[in-house]
Amino acid sequence: MSVTVHENRKSRTSTGSMNISLYHKLSHSDCVLNHLNTMRKQRLFTDVTLWAGNRSFPCHRAVLAACSQYFEAMFSNGLRESLDNTVNFHDSLHPEVLELLLDFAYSSKIIINEENAESLLEAGDMLQFHDIRDAACEFLEKNLYPSNCLGMMILSDAHQCQRLYELSLRTCLSNFATLHNTEDFCSLSKDMVLDLISSDELEIEDEQVVFNSVLHWVKEDLDKRKDYFPELLRKVRLALLPSELLKEAVVCEDLIIADERSKLIMDEAVVCKKKILQNDGVVTSLCAKPRKAGHTLLILGGQTFMCDKIYQVDHKAKEIIPKADLPSPRKEFSACAIGCKVYVTGGRGSENGVSKDVWVYDTINEEWSKSAPMLIARFGHGSAELENCLYVVGGHTAVAGVFPASPSVSLKQVEKYDPLTNKWTMMAPLRDGVSNAAVVSAKLKLFAFGGTSIHRDRVSKVQCYDPDENRWSIKAECPQPWRYTAAAVLGSQIFIMGGDTEFTAASAYRFDCETNQWTRIGDMTAKRMSCHALASGNKVYVVGGYFGTQRCKTLDCYDPTSDSWNSITSVPYSLIPTAFVSTWKHLPA
C-alpha cells in the first residue's frame, strides 16, 4: 500500500484531528518469557550451552545477558565464550544451583530455603544475579541464629552483604560468651575478630573471656597470626582484668613475653589500673572502659515535669528503683553520662529561671557535687559525650544582654566541658540554631537531628560536628521535619524515634552515619513525644513521653535483629521521665 493511500485511510475525528489509541497488553512480557522457557526446554533457538558438573543447560544468550551483567559482559566483550557455543563452569558451580538461577531467569520465580540460601547467595554474587543475591541475603537475615551467626559473618563479608554482616555481627556480640571458643570463631579473619572485641556492644561482663578468646584465636594458627596479637591485645579492656591476672600474664604468657609491643600495652594497662584506684573514679583510657553490658541504666524524673529524683533500671528484676534525690529540682535540662558520672546541665528551676548550673552525680559514691557552670544559661538543649568531654548543643536562653536571644529563639551556641580541667570552652556554632533536637555522638562526631528553629518551625536537617575541623555541616535531610524526638546509637547506626505530630509520634528510623542513608524500622508500641532513648547490649531502650493527654507508661526495648519492639516493664505512674542515661556499673578493682 502506498503512503498516500495509507494517509487517506487514517482515522480522523470530525474536526480532522488524529484519533489515537494505545494498546498495552499487561501480560505480554509474561507470555513472552513463558514461551521462551518452553523453547528452552524443547531446545528451540538456543545458542549457548552452560555446563556445571556433568550436566548441560541449553539457553538463549539474550535471556542470560538481560538477567546478568556477568553474562552480558561475557557475550559482548570479545571473550572466548562470546564465540563458543559452550560455557563450562566445571565444579565451581553446583548443577542444581545453576538450574535454579536459570529457572528464575526464564520465569522470574525461585524458591529459597535453608538448604539452598547460602549457595544461591554465592552463585548469585558470582554470576551477578543481583536480585537473587539480595533475596538470599534477606532470607538469611530472617533466619539468623546464635548457632549460625559466625558463619554468616564470614559469608556476608566474602560477598559484601553489608546489612547481613551487621545483623550477624550484632548476633555474635549478643552471644559472645557461648561463641568465643567455637571452631567458627577460630575461622574468623583478623578484621572480624577486631570488629567483635573492639565493640562497646560486646555482651560480656567478664573481660577475661575476651582476653582468653584473643589468645585462643592467635594460637589456633600461631605462625600466621602471632604478628596480629598486639593489635588485638590493644582492643581488650585490660584494666578490667583482675590485678593478679594482669601480673601473671606479663610474667607467664609467651605471646606477651616474646613481643615488645605487647609488653608495652600490658605495662600501660597496669599503670591505668593503679590510676583507677588512686583517682577515685576518674577514668578516660579505653583499656578501662566497660562494655555497655556492664552499664547501669538511670532514669531522671519526678512526679511532675519538675525532675527531683534518679531511678535505676533493674534489667533482671524488671523493676525501676528510686536511687537518689536531685539537689536542685529542675525541668527542661539535659543529662549525659561520662564514665561513672552523670552530668545534669542547665534547665529551669521552680521559679522558671534559666540556669547555667552543672550538677554531677557520682554513681560510685552516690553523691552530688557542682562543677564549673556553663558559659550560657540554657534549657531545651541537648548534650552528648565525645572523647571524654561533654558537649551541650543549642537550646534556649533568657539571659538578657549576653546574646541577642530570648526563650523563643533557638541557640546556635555549642559549649565543650573537659572534666579533667573543669573548664568550659565555646566551640563552632551550629549551622542552624535549634532547640528540642536529638543530640548524640557516633563515630567520633556529634549529630543533631531536627529540632525547633529560630522561627519555631520543625527542622528537617541532620547537623554534624567534626571535632578535628571544629566545624558543623549538614549531612542529610530527615525523612520528615522533627522535634521532641529521641536518639540512641549502636555502632555506626543511629536510631531516631518519636515526635510531636500524628505521623512521627510512633515512627522509628535508622540512620547510617557513615553512608548518611535512612531506613524505616518497625513502629514503636505507642506514640511518644519528648521520649528518651539509649542503647545497651545491642538493643535500644525508650522510656517516657506522651501524646495528647496520654502518658506512655512502659519501658520498651527494640531488637534490631528481629526489627521488633516489646515492653520490658511499666514505669511507676508517679514517675515522669525527663532524661535517660547509661553509666558504668563500677570501676574494676
Curated annotation (Swiss-Prot):
Residue ranges constituting the BACK domain according to the UniProt record: 149-250
GO cellular component terms attached to this protein's record: Cul3-RING ubiquitin ligase complex
BTB domain boundaries: 46-114
GO biological process: positive regulation of CD4-positive, CD25-positive, alpha-beta regulatory T cell differentiation; positive regulation of fatty acid oxidation; protein ubiquitination; regulation of translational initiation; ubiquitin-dependent protein catabolic process
Kelch repeat ranges per the UniProt record: 296-340, 341-388, 389-444, 446-492, 493-538, 539-585
UniProt-recorded Gene Ontology molecular function terms: ubiquitin-like ligase-substrate adaptor activity
Gene3D superfamilies documented for this protein: 1.25.40.420, Kelch-type beta propeller, Potassium Channel Kv1.1, Chain A
Transmembrane segments: none
Domain of life, per lineage: Eukaryota
Keywords: Kelch repeat, Repeat, Translation regulation, Ubl conjugation pathway
Pfam families the UniProt entry points to: BACK, BTB, Kelch_1, Kelch_KLHDC2_KLHL20_DRC7
Entry keyword Repeat: yes
Biological or metabolic pathway of the protein: Protein modification; protein ubiquitination
Assembly and interaction partners: Component of the BCR(KLHL25) E3 ubiquitin ligase complex, at least composed of cul3, klhl25 and rbx1.
Known function: Substrate-specific adapter of a BCR (BTB-CUL3-RBX1) E3 ubiquitin ligase complex involved in various processes, such as translation homeostasis and lipid synthesis. The BCR(KLHL25) ubiquitin ligase complex acts by mediating ubiquitination of hypophosphorylated eif4ebp1 (4E-BP1): ubiquitination and subsequent degradation of hypophosphorylated EIF4EBP1 (4E-BP1) probably serves as a homeostatic mechanism to maintain translation and prevent eIF4E inhibition when eIF4E levels are low.
Designated name of the protein: Kelch-like protein 25
Organism: Xenopus tropicalis (Western clawed frog)
